């Protein structure tokens, strides 16, 4: 009704997980006997996406976000939200014995637990599931210093921020900060869909 009232027609509807996967999963690579996970860490929530057998098998929301970490720093150190945001970006996750940073350690440990439970659920409830050999990170929170190292260490799975531009066939180099691009992974994935299925071909799939 809203679109009709604006004089617009819906061409396609797509869940965010599908858009993220289109950008973050290497299109030209064949994943044989292995699976991938995408960890999308946003401002208000995070999502873990399981990609196996050339398809998204399922996704799960996780209680972890950039705003959650910033608010925790602000409350713990009794500083403004903006100052806490600056400290978060500057220092990242200091995974060491620090009273001021202990709250971030606790929140990140809970994230690890949530990811592990999600992976265990996938292995036990999905037939012919392959082992997840890598976690590709995206979203604005994926640039948090040391987070990839902590996840790799705790989960014993290689974890690293991905490249949101890797599936774009462009003759010219992309002049955009790779880390900053990760916050636009969904938008880039949607753009890739449009590039693969031009609207003028009446392809509404």
Describe each model-derived feature in a short phrase.
Residues 1-205:
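Hydrophobic/aromatic-enriched cytosolic interaction surfaces used to assemble or bind macromolecules
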